[in-house]
Amino acid sequence: MAKYADITGWGKCMPPAVMTNDDMASVIDTSDEWIVSRSGISERRVSHVPGSDLAAVAGHRALACAGLQPEEVDLLIVATCTPDTVIPSTAAHVQ
C-alpha cells in the first residue's frame, strides 16, 4: 500500500430538486432578501434518496474519471453533515 495519497479523479452527484429562498418563504415567515443577507444562500438541493446513494454515484464517476476499478482503491473517505445513520457510517454504506 502506498504511503501517500493522490486525488486521481473526482465525481459529484447532486439531487435534481432545488428549493429556492422564495420556495422557503412560502412555507415559513422569511424572504429571499433576509436569507441571502444573513447566509449568502439563494438555493439549496433537496434529496429524496439517502446520501449514501448519491455518494455511490459520485464514487463511480470518480473511478471513471481516474480510470480505476473499485478494487484498486485502498481507502474510502466520506465527509458529510447529514449521514444516513449514525452507525454504520455513510462510508460503510457506500463501500
PLM feature spans:
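Conserved "HGTGT" condensation-loop signature of ketosynthase/thiolase-family condensing enzymes
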Residues: M1-I77, Q95
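Active-site-proximal gating segment of KS-fold condensing enzymes and close homologs
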Residues: I77-Q95
